[in-house]
Amino acid sequence: MCEHLKSMDVLKVETFYQPNPTAIFHHICRNRSNTLLLESAEINNKKNLESMMIVDSALRISALNMVVTLEALTKNGESLLPVFKSLLPKEVRILSNDNFLKIKFPSIVKDIDEDKKLHVLSIFDSIRFLINSVKNNKGSKSMFFGGLFAYDLVSSFENLPKLKTSQSCPDFCFYLSEILLVLNHKRRTCYIQASLFSSSNLERNKLQHRLLEVKNKLSQNFYPLESTSLKKMILKCNRTDREYEKIIKEMKKSIMIGEIFQVVPSRKFYLPCTNSLAAYDVLKKNNPSPYMFFMQDSNFTLFGASPESSLKYDTLSRKIEIYPIAGTRPRARKIDGSIDLDLDSRIELEMRTNHKELSEHLMLVDLARNDLAKICDPGTRYVADLTQVDKYSHVMHLVSRVVGKLRLDLDVFHAYQACMNMGTLSGAPKIRAMELISNAEKEKRGSYGGSIGYFTASGTLDMCIIIRSAYVENNIATIQVGAGIVLDSIPQLEVDESKNKAKAVLQAISESHSCHIELNIENERHTFAG
């Protein structure tokens, strides 16, 4: 079959460095679907590190339940579909057979050995088949996929309650880059890359022309980011403080009788959001984070500034990392809004020595160790950093880093399948905690608690947990936040923590729409005039 595989070529041009990725995205991508901006900043000094932007996508691959959809967005992307179809095993049914290819995978027997389950045919194989459609694809970013794995993807692999949803978020959604723009903020360099999958000279000429077009756009004056003004914002939540506190108390009962040790129930806040990019721009300026993202899909927009890595893998070293965060405190501020350094340091010390926070954190470090033990070579797993503190605009977190060496018989998708969803967004034991979450929340989480980032055909993967984020559909932003509950949890403090976690995103939306809101949430609806 190898003679049928596609050969790819990478066309690359260096261009002018621009320090403002949001302005570039607005200037080049505007409101086009299937575009993505991924950014990173130093935790300590908040300086930008790297920005990657999918300007044009060749193909969109998504999954919902056991059905995978491949949508060719260009002729270049379309050229991959015949080879992809030839790689499908007979167990996979083709439901529609055109540029909008739909395929159905068989359901997985969920009550089998964990290691056997990793090797059973699954929707993750659709990504593997797509990667394997191209034979010379191992350049560092030559075959670059950006997008998300939803929290609810786990339901295809574990026996969890079936839930309703009002959102259009699939179980996973990734764009295969056709035009990728990469900014290195430390070196102040920029290059644009085109990935050519078609053997057609016409397609090659199109991509060469598109490279020059994007390069020329970078030398033009940028369109200013439009300002949006709303006279009032109605802030809603799906659960009042009292209702959320009741759920927390019920979860504590499950902990007391020994069903679970820790669990992360969540609540949702809703705000109007008619200018998502402006809100993202404010969020990243106010709250620079290791992972910042703006995903513009045909059905939704997702943006955020996440402090927490989900899974990170380096192909050369085979090193795989989990970065558990558990333990949160608000930053201390003076009346003028600046950080009160003395009080801030005392709050940090209290968090570092708090029995409840330490027990919750160490429980999740242990869970991360157990997750990696399933997929790593024996003797390679260790805790690289333990109970450090990372500080952001509104909160500080207790963090650790757990590292191992991935087994040779596994790839990053096996690793993700084995580790989802991260314990810091589910609990321990993980499956029972997720069952209790489903029973309490009664609807799908969608993007919240899943992950967003990128992977390449060479095997590199870097994803963050989707928190401190807004999922926007029909001009309504959903901001979902949770609190880690253990035996020592004080319900009112956990309610307060959920609101502290929401503040940065809610403030960014209100500021970008010139409308003031407050966070005194006791009823389901409040009007905040600005």
From Swiss-Prot:
GO terms for biological process: L-tryptophan biosynthetic process. The keyword Nucleus does not apply. Its cofactor is Mg(2+). Keywords: Amino-acid biosynthesis, Aromatic amino acid biosynthesis, Lyase, Magnesium, Metal-binding, Tryptophan biosynthesis. L-tryptophan binds at S40, P290, Y291, M292. SUPFAM superfamilies: ADC synthase (SSF56322). It comes from the Bacteria. It is an enzyme of class 4 (lyase). Pathway: Amino-acid biosynthesis; L-tryptophan biosynthesis; L-tryptophan from chorismate: step 1/5. Pfam families: Anth_synt_I_N, Chorismate_bind. Signal peptide: none annotated. NCBIfam families: PRK13564.1, trpE_proteo. Part of a heterotetrameric complex that catalyzes the two-step biosynthesis of anthranilate, an intermediate in the biosynthesis of L-tryptophan. In the first step, the glutamine-binding beta subunit (TrpG) of anthranilate synthase (AS) provides the glutamine amidotransferase activity which generates ammonia as a substrate that, along with chorismate, is used in the second step, catalyzed by the large alpha subunit of AS (TrpE) to produce anthranilate. In the absence of TrpG, TrpE can synthesize anthranilate directly from chorismate and high concentrations of ammonia. Belongs to the anthranilate synthase component I family. This is Anthranilate synthase component 1. It comes from Buchnera aphidicola subsp. Schlechtendalia chinensis.
